[in-house]
Regions:
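Activation segment of protein kinase catalytic domains, centered on the conserved DFG
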Residues: 210-231
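Conserved catalytic-loop aspartate of Hanks-type protein kinases
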Residues: 308
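Catalytic-loop of the protein kinase fold
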Residues: 239, 243-260
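Terminal C-lobe "cap" of eukaryotic-type protein kinase domains
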Residues: 365-368, 375-390
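Glycine-rich ATP phosphate-binding loop
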Residues: 126-151
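Activation segment/activation loop of eukaryotic-type protein kinase catalytic domains
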Residues: 255-291
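Short beta-strand micro-motifs within the conserved protein kinase catalytic domain, predominantly
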Residues: 179-190
Length: 422
């Protein structure tokens, strides 16, 4: 039988007498075939057992993972980035985990009149509203701006939202900074309540001055050189206050200055200051347009208040030109090489020598050569004495936002806004 099987493997005809299979040839042919077959069977069994073991481990890991998450969400390292419904998480535990005690800022939700809620814009993590807040005096209401954290948010976003409230609380009150009124963190949704700055941002105001005479508190209003100095002094005072707090702003620009009644300037846009304070300069995610940045920031060096002084010079340029984009002849991608060649902006036709001198002092390449906020205030106070208070600044050309955004290197959508929270 073995020989017959061997003849078949050799494809020998049964009648072929020349095909003779000797005993040793049978061993050479049959034994390897049997070994190969045995090896294939063993390999198949091993693979089957391995796959079965992997499947069992995955099922066990999945089951244990669900048990851990059901028992305690905070014990899992993955919950930091996993999105959850805030309605399923006690707000008190979120406050405890963030180690924030905000009870002294708490405002009763009933004091926010729901019938007065007006949507301003949809933010990245929630909506921003304008509302009326009861002041405690019968019949007297105060207009405020409410930033609400969306119900669907990650634990990190909740921690960040609460951190911004705490940051503003620690910052304290200054007449030239947008003020935190209070918060609602006793239940969902979480609210951050800020003062309402009625006249909007300075950049829009400057553009409107090009079109027509502004009206402020019912009185026709436009812009003079002296008023540019007045706004400059108020922004410099806010910078001096930030310097005392060992902070820097990071994005000084007309778009981040709000105008209140009586022409009071309020510096806003403190998001970068918060991120730097909370997470460090290397972890900042906010993007600042390059044409407002000091050279050291473009070179990725550690920021300081002296970088804000450079940007302050750009702010003066914006005001005296009624909102013209800086470096109009330079593309945003070429701005660093332009500055490295020791170039600065030329004196605008509407700018007097004294103001341009202050601008140039702000644009010193070496940060140590620039004035401090206190020095800046003194220079502005000296220059305002000889400034013009009757000649109205006039720029006949209206601004096209899309063209401005392209030249200035900013997002055109960021220019259309009524309010900035932090």
């Amino acid at each position: 039988d073995v020989k017959r099987f061997t003849r078949m493997l050799l494809e020998c005809n049964n009648n072929d007498k020349l095909c003779v299979v000797r005993e040793y040839q049978t061993e050479v042919i049959v034994v390897p075939v049997l070994l190969v077959g045995f090896f294939v069977i063993v390999l198949t069994v091993i693979l089957w057992l391995h796959c079965r073991g992997l499947r069992a481990k995955q099922e066990q890991s999945s089951a244990s993972g669900h048990q851990v998450n059901d028992k305690n969400l905070q014990e899992s390292s993955s919950t930091e980035n996993r999105y959850i419904q805030l309605s399923e998480t006690p707000v008190e535990s979120l406050l405890n985990s963030a180690s924030l005690n905000l009870k002294e800022l708490e405002i009763l939700r009933e004091k926010l009149s729901p019938g007065t809620l007006q949507l301003i814009k949809h933010g990245r993590c929630g909506s921003i509203y304008r509302a009326q807040l009861e002041t405690g005096n019968p019949g007297k209401m105060k207009t405020v701006v409410v930033k609400a954290l969306q119900d669907l948010a990650s634990p990190q976003e909740v921690k960040d939202f609460l951190g911004r409230i705490k940051f503003h609380q620690n910052l304290g009150h200054h007449e030239n900074l947008v003020e935190l009124v209070g918060c609602c963190v006793d239940q969902l949704p979480l609210y951050m309540i800020m003062e309402d700055v009625s006249l909007g941002d300075l950049l829009t105001f400057l553009w409107t001055c090009r079109k027509d005479v502004m009206t402020m508190d019912g009185i026709p209003y436009d812009l003079t050189e002296r008023q540019v100095y007045e706004v400059g002094q108020q922004v410099a005072a806010a910078l001096a206050y930030l310097e005392q707090k060992k902070l820097f702003h990071g994005d000084i620009a007309a778009r981040n200055v709000l105008l209140h009644h009586n022409f009071t300037a309020k510096l806003c846009g403190l998001g970068l200051a918060y991120e730097t304070h909370a997470y460090g300069a290397n972890s900042v995610t906010q993007i600042v347009p390059v044409k407002w940045q000091a050279p050291e920031r473009l070179l990725k060096k550690p920021p300081s208040i002296k970088a804000d002084i450079w940007s302050f010079g750009i702010l003066l340029y914006e005001m005296i030109t009624l909102g013209a984009p800086p470096y109009p002849e330079v593309t945003p991608s070429d701005i660093l090489s332009y500055l490295q060649r020791q170039n600065i902006m030329k004196q605008p036709s509407s700018c007097q020598k004294a103001m341009y001198g202050i601008m140039k002092s702000c644009w010193q390449w070496n940060a140590t050569d620039r004035p401090s906020p206190a020095d800046l205030i003194r220079s502005l106070q000296t220059a305002i004495k000889t400034s013009k208070d009757h000649a109205v600044l006039q720029v006949p050309e209206p601004v096209v936002p899309e063209l401005y955004a392209r030249v200035a290197g900013v997002d055109v959508h960021s220019l259309v806004r009524e309010y900035t929270v932090l």
